[in-house]
Amino acid sequence: MKAAVLIWLFLMGSQARHFWQQDEPPQSPWDRVKDLATVYVDSVKDSGRDYVSQFETSTLGKQLNLKLLDNWDSLTSTVNKLREQLGPVTQEFWDNLEKETEELRQEMSKDLEEVKAQVQPYLDNFQKNWQEEMNLYSQKLEPLRTELQEGALQKLQDLQEKLSPLAEQVRDRARAHVNTLRTQLAPYSDELRQRLATRLEALKENSGASLAEYHAKASEHLSALGEKAKPALDDLRQGLLPVLESFKVSFLSALEEYTKKLSSQ
């Protein structure tokens, strides 16, 4: 089940962006996942180092003298090495998954393009109506702006009383346009869901490209990923042992020294 969900997210992540954003340069699913993971890891790494630095420069940190920053930098170096080792392995996993789902992604892309072509006139009409409303609103505001410049409105309350009906009118018109657009697009949204259901049902009936096969292939790729990542994870564990041992020794030594100072007072 998890593998099927992974495939579904992978497919939609590959294609849904192009439904509304054709002008952006294409980006592979792996690039998006890698960018997200890199930003997250770097954020955690930077914020974690800041916390360690703040503690080490505090009064208690100076008394304990744990050399946390040295240990943190060693840990960061080890983790970066792990990321470099796993890079080709995870890239191979995504390449295999992309290859296995190529046909299904092409069909989904075709469906999305067809639905987009059908709804585009409604979107264009909505944009046209909205622009007309904004132009009309601007025209109605022009006399108020002129009065304000000429000093005819002495109080801000007078201006607010004149603007409120216009603002309410624009809000009501905008709501009406949005509701109309929602009503117009509803059948196409249902059609897209139906097409997706049809594609998935076809997968179930087609022994050559069934969901069970995708599940098995995804599980196989995940298993291969785990096997190839095992040496790198073992290296990480071996690299962490000296860091943890150094931290343990420093902490116990600092604690013992701190206890002696308290006893002597």
Curated annotation (Swiss-Prot):
One BP annotation, GO: phospholipid homeostasis
- Native organism is Aotus nancymaae (Ma's night monkey)
The positions making up the signal sequence are 1-16
What superkingdom does the record give?
Eukaryota
Region (10 X approximate tandem repeats), start-end ranges: 66-265
User: Which sections of the protein are sequence repeats?
Assistant: 66-87, 88-109, 110-120, 121-142, 143-164, 165-186, 187-208, 209-230, 231-241, 242-265
Indicate where this protein is primarily found.
secreted
List the Gene Ontology MF annotations in alphabetical order.
amyloid-beta binding; apolipoprotein A-I receptor binding; chemorepellent activity; cholesterol binding; cholesterol transfer activity; enzyme binding; heat shock protein binding; high-density lipoprotein particle binding
Q: Which cysteines are joined by disulfide bonds?
A: none
Task: Sum up the protein's function in the record's words.
Answer: Participates in the reverse transport of cholesterol from tissues to the liver for excretion by promoting cholesterol efflux from tissues and by acting as a cofactor for the lecithin cholesterol acyltransferase (LCAT). As part of the SPAP complex, activates spermatozoa motility.
- What is the name of the protein in this document? Apolipoprotein A-I
